[in-house]
Amino acid sequence: MDMYQKRKIRAEKKNNDSQKSLPSTSINWFPGHMAKTRRQIVEDLKMIDVVVEILDARIPNSSQNPDIRQITQNKKKVIILNKYDLSDKAKIEKWIEYFIQKGQKVVLADSLTGRGINETIRQIQKIMEDDMQKMADKGRIGRKIRVMIVGIPNVGKSSFINRISKKTSAEVGNKPGVTKQKQWIRINEKIELLDTPGVLWTKFENENVAMNLAITGTIKDDILELTEVAYTLIKFMLENYSSNLLQRYSLNEELVNEILSQDQAENENIYEIMQLIGKKRGAILGGRVDDERTSKLILDDFRSGKLGNITLEMPE
């Protein structure tokens, strides 16, 4: 089979799979338990002093549920940029400026190592200092600061709670939505925390948001076509972190540039580089590169930090 025939087959396959892959505006899913959780959050907010919202530092905008942002807008808030260890430190500085300009407190965190935990506690107590003093003046001594922690699935919320509470009570897993039941957790003598399950929005209106969530593994790998997700990541890295990609997969820079300069559709050039990575990693099935296996190993490398420190988006 020559290259022309292979391209024709891939084009036909891409056309057949288009309903599953892009555009992301066609993705309309909302598990029933998430609708129930949203209603519960609205009810619980009545007794909450401070909202701690956990975002993924690699995708601060895409990992912020606009629905949750709207229903918590009148509450004091601390923004946690979690998974900071996996993010691009230079780009994160721009995000810090962005949130500060919006009048929000920001903490850089890594829930796996405990980075940012003490700073989060300090910010919660600082933001409530005046209110607690007013309560004390009125004789309400010993009243704890009530904090709600929110975030979409798979941003490291359970690990963060375990760190801040010095316990392992919250069930932790790699799959979205693993923590489902409401629970109050004592942080110290001044703070008690209400955990909530992760909530995604009903429909992804923005194609980039949907793809960023897929790349980081926030939504399940069967929501979007895996090869499309890996393709998008490779394209982004070639434009922004090419040296990371070349180094990880021992790719020859001249060969990659030659492929990219070929007089053919851009998607064909990127696909050839995916094939090259598959060959390098031995992702072969029946004598040919296994696209799905190649896509999975590329995404796994990104999610585990093996492709380096990367942030996928910048403030607008």
Task: Show where each model-derived region lies.
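Active-site cofactor/substrate anionic-group-binding motifs, chiefly glycine-
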Residues: K75-D85
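Helix-rich effector regions associated with P-loop NTPase G domains
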Residues: M1-V50, R58-I59, Q64, I71-K77, ...
